Amino acid sequence: WPMVATPPRRLIYVFNTFHPKVLALTARGPGLRPWPRTEYVLISAFQKKMLGIEGEIHPSPIDIKRFHPRPPSPDQFAPAARPLVVGRLSRDTADKHDAQDLALYRTLPAEGWQVRLQGATSLREQLPADPALQLTPEGSVDAADFLRGLDVFYYRTGDHVETFGRVVFEAMACGVPVVCHRHGGYADHIRHGENGFLFDTTDQAAAILHQLRHDPALRTSVGTNARRTVEDMFSPSALQARMTFFRS
């Protein structure tokens, strides 16, 4: 039908992947009649840089009413009151996990962490059976409830590169300090040590987790700033500006 349809006034393509083939397919209108130039809406500056194309950047929407912080607890400044929980959430596929993290997961329980990995049953044969190391299927707990149950969110992927990384922002919206590998679209919004943490190596990640474990005030301040960051990203004025782009 596009071959015979009347060309639209504007042609906007919301592009949220890294696949260059998609660019070739969408750069030109179909048929013999002239179509308007394709306008791209991208979801991160990281994606824009990696692809080397022009486009409007609109972060992938997050429901910040659903993903909200848990109420303050009396023991939040008492590290010995309960085991601290570090965890991550993703699809249960091998490309979502980095093999370098296996060694880290093995050591964290001995340091006093409880580790919760939802969407990690694919790692079961590579990790020891340990009550403090929980591997659960993808979707076994509601995402918002799972993230609110963490003290720290940890994230690094394997072959899969996050164009945006929704789950990182969902964790930030829940007021959870995030510790993430630097290579991903989420890194555009993380100010290291202020509203989250970025690392390049496993040793750096381990050092950050050690610091957070022993500094409850830092966990609280970074989590609070993380929530504010996401609120700013999806404020009424920011959402209105994005709608104005489509309506113009």
Each language-model region and where it sits:
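Extended catalytic core of nucleotide-activated donor transferases of GT-like folds
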Residues: 1-36
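Short hydrophobic beta-strand element within catalytic cores of glycosyltransferases
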Residues: 177-180, 198
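Short alpha-helical segment that forms part of, or immediately flanks, the ligand-binding pocket
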Residues: 144, 166-173, 187-188, 194
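Conserved catalytic-core segment of nucleotide-activated headgroup transferases in glycan assembly
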Residues: 62-141
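Acidic donor-binding loop of glycosyltransferase active sites
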Residues: 148-163, 176
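Conserved acidic donor-binding segment of nucleotide-sugar-dependent glycosyltransferases
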Residues: 192-203, 211-216
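A charged, aromatic-enriched C-terminal amphipathic alpha-helix characteristic of glycosyltransferases
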Residues: 72, 216-247
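Donor nucleotide-sugar binding/catalytic pocket of nucleotide-sugar-dependent glycosyltransferases
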Residues: 14, 18-20, 35-73
